[in-house]
Amino acid sequence: MLSRRSFLNTSFGAGVALAAPAAQQAAAQTPAPRPARRIVDAQVHLWKANAPDRPWPPNTVPQLPQPFGYDQLLPMMDEAGAERVVIVPPSWEGDRIDYAMEAHAKHPTRFGIMGRIPLADPQSAALLPKWKEQPGMLGIRVSFNAEQTAWLRNGTADWFWPAAEKAGIPVMFLAPGNLPIFAGIAERHPRLALIIDHMGLSIDIAKAGEREEAVAQAAALAKYPNVSVKLSSAPTYSSEPYPYRDMTPFIRRLYDAFGPRRCYWGTDMTNSFAKATYRQRIAHFTEELAFLSEEDKDWIMGRAIVGRLGW
């Protein structure tokens, strides 16, 4: 039997000895595999049917003719590779959050909630100190559509901003066309996390050809560190099929203004249900936006919203 010294003195042994350091060096230079990207959807509406035992407010219209529940959503998430979803209870159900809480109770690792409150009632301030003690509750979403827009100007909503700031509650807000008002709110309440919904866009704004102006309003709020933006519902506001190239300049403008750590991907899928599959909505950002680095995608596709909401 050859000793180690005798083995190394052979030509074969010398080759092995020389190859070993080279193999070790090559292994050291091989980059470690990237960790799996977390896909966290910053907005989906879930709702139950309008029924006598669970009535909706009058004259409200859902985004789909049939209810859309978590049992329908979960297989879509699994097929597309989405880890979590932020449930935003829809306005047509009023201010109730019971179905969102049911979804979280049954699937606590998959669903978080941005709840709703009766914003026009100042007594709702009593709900805020313990708001986030509710299971799955991440923050509050407020909407300013149609007649609710006046609440931003007539003092109706004034009580809410300092109360939410004091309670440490992140706020998502839908106020298309009215974003300049939030410059003052952001400045007066620097510890209040404010999240712009849907890039500042709406269907009416898109139809009117005013997307550029609305996105500019959103970008102007990037100067405030406590403001961030959901790059959500892109198919809804596009006039083109997948991959929605007409939306790229708007997404790029907000990415440049806010940076990837203050931008959040989201589907808002029921608002444009027939325009894209769940997988396409993910691939739009992970495969079709060439200006995003892999690290940018990690932040925008999930890491940033999880951090902002403390999830």
Regions found by a protein language model. Name each.
Residues 83-84, 93-177, 184, 228-234, ...:
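Active-site gating/metal-coordination segments in enzymes
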Residues 95-110, 247-256, 281-288:
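Short, electropositive alpha-helical surface patch
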Residues 43-47, 198:
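Histidine-centered divalent metal-coordination motifs
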Residues 268:
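Active-site glycine-centered loops adjacent to acidic/histidine catalytic or metal-binding residues
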Residues 138, 151-264:
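Catalytic pocket-lining loop regions of alpha/beta-barrel enzymes
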Residues 74, 101-102, 129, 183, ...:
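Active-site phosphate/pyrophosphate- and oxyanion-stabilizing loops and adjacent acidic/basic residues
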Residues 47-67, 205-207:
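Acidic/histidine-rich helix-loop elements
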Residues 2-21, 30-42, 62-84, 252-253, ...:
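Mid-to-C-terminal alpha-helical segments outside catalytic/metal-binding sites
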